[in-house]
Amino acid sequence: EGRCGGAGTGKTVTLQVLAEGFSAAGVPVFMADVKGDLAGIAVAGSADHKLHEAFTKRAATIGLDLQYQAFPVTFWDLFGEQGHPIRATVAEMGPLLLSRLLELTEPQEGVLNVAFRLADEEELPLLDLKDLQALLTFIAEHDSEISARYGLVSSTSVGAIQRRLLVLENQGAAQMFGEPALELADLMRCDAHGR
């Protein structure tokens, strides 16, 4: 659900309070935090905070006992530099999504579909971009027999796909592909204490 409002209207605090409440109840929470504003729930507050007195007063007014506590978090990071890496296998991404990502033409997309079909039928793992590059090289070297089996596979299209993969690798995307692959359950789990 989206939260809209101007600066200082309490959007971040509202999300933090909701996440803390769900976590305390044992309900896993996933939140996108591009700016890092929500990351504060990973560390317990302290009596040294400039607003501690105001917090204590407010808690007493509404009949609560103020207790600072940290909540379990996992910071996910596409490149694995400042958090837990997010990975997917090439096979899990599939030819359609990968074709869109690479901005392939229709004939090139057809060749990529042939590559995925061949990998599936021959039980070849497509875990990372190196696996896909190796498969495309094999297809280019055996284009006549593969064309007879699946339809025309041009070496020009194979070369174009390989160049697009090179661009993707140069942008650091190779780190995203591989194992262990991210599963939905990885995003929605509790810690050892059920929070």
Tell where the protein language model's regions lie, with residue ranges.
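Hydrophobic anchor at the beta1->P-loop junction of P-loop NTPases
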Residues: R3
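Hydrophobic positions on the alpha1 helix immediately C-terminal to the Walker A/P-loop
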Residues: T14, L18
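The conserved Walker
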Residues: G6-A7
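P-loop NTPase motor domains
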Residues: A19-P28, G36-K50, A54-R195
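Conserved lysine of the Walker
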Residues: K11
